[in-house]
Amino acid sequence: MAEVHIIGQIIGASGFPQHSLFCKWGLHTGGAWKLLSGVVEGQTQVDHPQNDDMAFWSHPIDMHFATKGLQGWPKLHLQVWHQDTFGRNELYGYSFLHIPSTPGTHTLLSPTWRPLGTWQEQICQMFVGGGPQLKSASLIYGGSDRYRLQTVAMGQVHLELTVILRNFERYGVESS
């Protein structure tokens, strides 16, 4: 079977209204993909930058897949959270990106968004915190339902990923 190695890191995030951020991430693939090694979900530590607009995580990503075809190419979905001084967590944004299908090292920016909610929810969020969240993470990377949501743009997540393709020609899988 053809193999794909995804190696890299979630560098950090910038452009968010508050510091003290962490990221939950996961990788979604189609049914023809088999994980050979690594983990497909995780969470970074909380970073509270003192003098910088960017929270740094340097969280490693290392996965090895076998596949029979390109259908269901991996998608990375991200959730950026803010942790306040009392240890309460508030969702700051969702994001997803397709893992590049070309071999090599890629520097990526993934813009984030969050559901806007009704005006009552927005007022409640200003005073109490929290805010609307998606019921299912599949809406982040899924089909057209995501485009019906009213959202507001948040910051962006910085990533560096290296993609290594192996045995694609041998098994007749064309990636270009």
Curated annotation (Swiss-Prot):
Keywords of the record: Cell projection, Cilium, Cilium biogenesis/degradation, Cytoplasm, Cytoskeleton
One MF term in the entry's GO annotations: gamma-tubulin binding
Keyword Cytoplasm attributed: yes
PROSITE patterns for the chain: C2_B9 (PS51381)
Locations listed in the record: Cytoplasm, Cytoskeleton, Cilium basal body; Cytoplasm, Cytoskeleton, Cilium axoneme
GO-annotated biological processes: cilium assembly
Subunit field text: Part of the tectonic-like complex (also named B9 complex).
Function statement: Component of the tectonic-like complex, a complex localized at the transition zone of primary cilia and acting as a barrier that prevents diffusion of transmembrane proteins between the cilia and plasma membranes.
Family: Belongs to the B9D family.
UniProt-recorded name of the protein: B9 domain-containing protein 2
